[in-house]
């Protein structure tokens, strides 16, 4: 009786009409239908761990927090990849051995800002000794993938272009993206339109820029493609980027870069000496300068010795593919082999990791602007027998994601 009376009191005090309705469901429901659409920060480490964390967690930690570098890793394990993707976004994974895998963001392990994450080998069937070369979020519906192209680059200097729809159907055990020769690795994979250019950088300090249309769209996936840049000796490609296409005459480029150097406070002697027909007396109209400035990409270059610089995309002439390219950094001043080179915005940050397990976060705006063939400035003060081994790009999230603290 006591229990009955207590339950009656609870009913009288808290009873409210049902707000939901129970109906018969005739359709099919997938797990994904129950997943809320939410922006996630996806983090990958050099030790092969991956996780997703709600972006709002980083916003809550903005004041006094450690921001995007807050995850727990071993001393030798550092963040190498970091980007924001929606829970329903398709992620294409490409490995250094030329395989492709596909997962939705929500299928990645969910972890807090300081969580370690889960080993990628427990999520994707990646062989020992193989690592992730690229992770590509694709927000476009799969039915539209046939209208997009994907560009691949290998360490041997080859490049290939395929329809993105070639990777619509990817089994759980993966799909061959590129049949690589022994000793060759996949360097990167990026979506590229016909109004964009491809840039390849080698570890010896060479760079080449050409239109994506210089590479035909391949029908198969096993070919290694065509030559993107001619390599000498033990040289190898270490970075591939896709930037805005822009054609300017040699005089326009010369005049623009002269004004750009003046704005950045560079000395007149710091010009590129590896180009023909450089006219230091060339002029450019204010309208053309504004047009070139609006289309400019800032190219970040980092070396194994910890040196780095920003340079103008207009400093890299558009040429045909297959050549030796131009100097991307002075041989006597670059401070080691080039580790990475890619376009950035001044609001972004980068995270550098060394062979000794040390890491540091650096705001892009603190890196000096230099001419293409000039040497870099010290970005990371490496010790003896220590080298920078990876550079992670941290895109700006409108000032909400983190505070910009260096670790």
Predicted regions and their residues:
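C-terminal interaction appendages of subunits in large macromolecular complexes
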Residues: 1-407
């Amino acid at each position: 009786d006591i229990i009955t009376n207590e339950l009656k009191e609870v009913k009288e005090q808290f009873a409210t009409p049902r707000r939901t309705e129970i109906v018969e469901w005739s359709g099919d429901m997938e797990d994904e239908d129950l997943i809320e659409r939410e922006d996630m920060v996806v983090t990958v480490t050099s030790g092969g761990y991956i996780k997703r964390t709600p972006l709002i967690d980083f916003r809550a930690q903005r004041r006094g927090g450690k921001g995007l570098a807050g995850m727990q890793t071993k001393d030798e394990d550092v963040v190498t990849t970091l980007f924001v993707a929606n829970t329903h976004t398709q992620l294409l994974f490409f490995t250094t051995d030329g395989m492709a895998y596909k997962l939705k963001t929500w299928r990645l392990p969910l972890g807090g800002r300081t969580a370690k994450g889960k080993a990628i080998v427990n999520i994707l069937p990646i062989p020992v000794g193989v690592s992730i070369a690229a992770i590509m979020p694709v927000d476009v519906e799969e039915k539209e993938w046939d209208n997009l192209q994907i560009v691949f680059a290998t360490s041997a200097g080859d490049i290939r272009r395929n329809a993105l729809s070639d990777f619509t159907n990817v089994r759980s055990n993966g799909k061959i993206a590129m049949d690589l020769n022994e000793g060759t690795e996949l360097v990167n994979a990026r979506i590229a339109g016909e109004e964009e250019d491809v840039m390849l950088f080698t570890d010896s300090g060479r760079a080449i820029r050409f239109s994506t249309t210089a590479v035909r769209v391949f029908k198969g996936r096993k070919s290694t493609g065509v030559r993107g840049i001619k390599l000498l000796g033990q040289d190898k490609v270490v970075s591939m980027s896709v930037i805005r296409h822009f054609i300017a005459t040699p005089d326009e480029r010369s005049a623009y870069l002269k004004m750009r150097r003046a704005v950045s406070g560079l000395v007149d002697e710091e010009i590129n000496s590896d180009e023909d027909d450089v006219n230091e007396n060339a002029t450019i109209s204010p309208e053309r300068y504004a047009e070139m400035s609006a289309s400019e990409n800032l190219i970040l270059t980092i070396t194994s010795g910890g040196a780095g610089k920003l340079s103008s995309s207009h400093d890299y002439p558009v040429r045909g593919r297959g050549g030796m390219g131009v100097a991307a950094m002075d041989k006597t001043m670059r401070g080691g082999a080039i580790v990475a080179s890619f376009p950035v915005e001044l609001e972004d940050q980068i995270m550098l990791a060394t062979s000794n397990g040390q890491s540091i976060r650096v705001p892009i705006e603190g890196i000096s602007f230099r001419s293409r063939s000039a040497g870099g400035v010290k970005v990371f003060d490496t010790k003896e027998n220590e080298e920078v081994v990876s550079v992670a790009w941290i895109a700006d999230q409108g000032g909400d994601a983190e505070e910009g603290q260096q670790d």
